[in-house]
Amino acid sequence: MIKKYEGCFLFRSEELEYKSALEEVKKQLVAFGAVDFVENSIGERALEYPVRKQLRGRYEIIEFKMASDNLRELEAQLKLIKNLLRYMILVKINRKVSVKKVKRRNFREYRDNRDIKEKEQPSESNVDADLKVN
């Protein structure tokens, strides 16, 4: 069955190593039947902890469609790519949002904001009482 996947890949930060590893990942994806690529480069970031003695890495997100039967073989091949530090492949789920839930949520936000505004504004009776006392 063909499913839509989203893969987050962490590469070494050096330009040449990054580009070669990214091309290798794309070749493996194509070899296992992935189609409809959408790439999004997040860029170079400092890592929270060292990964394979690297303190910085480049992130790349690739969305693709592929048969679910090939996923295990793909992951086995991705583990062999030298400059790929980490990867995570998730099934992308498109959820439908019902109109009733949106309307209900908007009403709740409106109601909550209205209550907050009423608490922030002093009531007229309190203002009149303060004036009479002075």
Curated annotation (Swiss-Prot):
Region described as Disordered: spans on this chain: 113-134
Biased composition (Basic and acidic residues): 113-122
GO cellular component, as recorded: ribonucleoprotein complex; ribosome
Pfam families cross-referenced by the UniProt entry: Ribosomal_S6 (PF01250)
One biological process term in Gene Ontology: translation
CDD domains: bS6
Single GO MF annotation: rRNA binding
Keyword annotations of the record: Ribonucleoprotein, Ribosomal protein, RNA-binding, rRNA-binding
Entry-linked NCBIfam families: S6
Family: Belongs to the bacterial ribosomal protein bS6 family.
Function, as annotated: Binds together with bS18 to 16S ribosomal RNA.
Name of the protein in its database record: Small ribosomal subunit protein bS6
Gene, per the UniProt record: rpsF
